[in-house]
């Protein structure tokens, strides 16, 4: 009898330890078929995914740190732009580790204390987060909402990121977006089809005044092409 009780107690303890050790699912399936990562205390966490069009593939290495800030590194692959020696794996490649929202200022200040709310994926990636800024010597939390939408072009050698900033504060704000353009050129002798050009830039720059509830949208575009 004592042996039976001991075995029964052990089985309960063993089953309980398995339940505790088993990690919770980070992603949940939505009604529309998308998967959603609702950011909670299960951070920091890093992950990656690959998306492709006809002329470009992109690997996104992304994550949310312990302070709920989003980070992103992009690896672009251009399969139609071949490099010497002419083998399958020798395509034009380039990484970009730039933080686009960090280029934008609100009332001449850096956006503060990003908090990612959720990440969704249904063929394209969507990231929802919020920032604060200093107003009259105090931080206004959740004052600027940001939506990132990340995807490759289906038929061009181009990868796009949409950025939509919304003024969620009770005050008028001024956003400044810089002119940002980057160009890389490969040596002519390195490419099967000669020299190649990789370009990245913002679709919009300038000073933008947003009243409460108003939005500003612009794109970051990364592309590759032959120079000839």
Predicted segments with their positions:
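Bacterial Sec-dependent N-terminal signal peptides
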Residues: 1-23
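Terminal accessory carbohydrate-recognition/targeting modules of carbohydrate-active enzymes
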Residues: 21-228
């Amino acid at each position: 009898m004592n042996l039976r009780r001991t075995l029964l107690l052990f089985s309960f303890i063993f089953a309980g330890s398995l339940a505790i050790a088993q990690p919770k699912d980070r992603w949940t399936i939505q009604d529309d078929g998308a998967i959603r990562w609702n950011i909670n205390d299960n951070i920091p966490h890093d992950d990656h995914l690959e998306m492709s069009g006809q002329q470009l593939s992109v690997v996104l290495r992304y994550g949310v740190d312990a302070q709920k800030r989003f980070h992103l590194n992009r690896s672009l692959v251009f399969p139609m732009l071949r490099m010497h020696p002419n083998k399958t794996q020798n395509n034009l490649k380039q990484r970009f580790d730039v933080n686009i929202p960090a280029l934008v200022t609100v009332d001449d200040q850096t956006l503060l204390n990003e908090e990612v709310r959720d990440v969704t994926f249904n063929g394209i990636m969507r990231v929802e987060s919020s920032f604060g800024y200093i107003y009259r010597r105090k931080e206004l939390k959740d004052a600027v909402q940001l939506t990132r939408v990340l995807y490759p072009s289906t038929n061009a050698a181009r990868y796009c990121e949409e950025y939509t900033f919304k003024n969620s504060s009770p005050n008028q704000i001024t956003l400044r977006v810089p002119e940002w353009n980057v160009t890389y050129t490969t040596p002519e002798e390195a490419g099967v089809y000669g020299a190649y050009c990789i370009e990245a830039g913002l679709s919009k720059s300038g000073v933008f005044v947003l009243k409460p509830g108003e939005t500003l949208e612009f794109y970051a575009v990364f592309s590759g092409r032959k120079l000839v």
